[in-house]
């Protein structure tokens, strides 16, 4: 196995099962986590890019759990492992919508995982960001809440 398809050190803290079960699931998986997407990247764009590596079974867009709008990640599942490995090799670190995307192994999509886990509904990493990132909704959500004018006139 080449270095580009090896497992990263990241592990989903919400995985239901032991560490060894998670490792086994990752090693056998045909599912990829895709991160650092623009909030404006479409499922069609993702399909066009990832289908160059093989037959994509399904794409599940990551959504803000409250607004149900894209929040910068998705899951891409292939029918066979070798095609997912090709995507790890050739798509990880490429540009999509002028952003370097990250591709990592995922133990397999489970309903509910398409929603952001942050307090405000999106991804945790976007809550604490202090820089302005137009492709990911501007400033970090917690910072935006602090600097937003108070519109509550009670």
Curated annotation (Swiss-Prot):
Predominant cellular place of this UniProt entry's protein: nucleus
Sequence positions that bind mRNA: 10, 33, 102-106, 113-117, 123-124
Signal peptide positions (record): none
Question: Where in or outside the cell?
Answer: Nucleus
Domain RRM as annotated: residue spans: 30-108
Concerning Pfam families, the annotation shows: RRM_1
Matching Gene3D superfamilies? 3.30.70.330
Kindly list the GO CC terms recorded for this protein.
Answer: nuclear cap binding complex; nucleus; presynaptic cytosol
**What keywords are annotated for this sequence in UniProt?**
mRNA processing, mRNA splicing, Nucleus, RNA-binding, RNA-mediated gene silencing
On the tree of life, the source organism's domain of life is: Eukaryota
Under the heading InterPro entries, the entry gives: NCBP2 (IPR027157), NCBP2_RRM (IPR034148), Nucleotide-bd_a/b_plait_sf (IPR012677), RBD_domain_sf (IPR035979), RRM_dom (IPR000504)
SUPFAM superfamilies (UniProt xref): RNA-binding domain, RBD (SSF54928)
| Job description of the protein | Component of the cap-binding complex (CBC), which binds co-transcriptionally to the 5' cap of pre-mRNAs and is involved in various processes such as pre-mRNA splicing and RNA-mediated gene silencing (RNAi). The CBC complex is involved in miRNA-mediated RNA interference via its interaction with Ars2 and is required for primary microRNAs (miRNAs) processing. Also involved in innate immunity via the short interfering RNAs (siRNAs) processing machinery by restricting the viral RNA production.
The entry's family comment says:
Belongs to the RRM NCBP2 family.
Q: Any idea what this protein is called?
A: Nuclear cap-binding protein subunit 2
Q: Which organism is it from?
A: Drosophila yakuba
Originating gene: Cbp20
């Amino acid at each position: 196995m080449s270095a580009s398809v090896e497992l990263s050190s990241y592990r989903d803290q919400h995985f239901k099962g032991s560490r060894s079960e998670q490792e086994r699931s990752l090693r056998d998986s045909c599912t990829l986590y895709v991160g650092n997407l623009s909030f404006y990247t479409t499922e069609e764009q993702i399909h066009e890019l990832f289908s160059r590596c093989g037959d994509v079974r399904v794409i599940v867009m990551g959504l803000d759990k409250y607004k149900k709008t894209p929040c910068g990640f998705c899951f891409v599942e292939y029918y066979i492992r070798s095609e997912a490995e090709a995507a790890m090799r050739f798509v990880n670190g490429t540009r999509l919508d002028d952003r370097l995307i990250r591709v990592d192994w995922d133990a397999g999509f489970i309903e509910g995982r398409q929603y952001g886990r942050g307090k405000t509904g999106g991804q945790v990493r976007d809550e604490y960001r202090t820089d302005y990132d137009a492709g990911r909704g501007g400033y970090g959500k917690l910072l935006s809440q602090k600097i937003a004018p108070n519109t509550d006139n009670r």
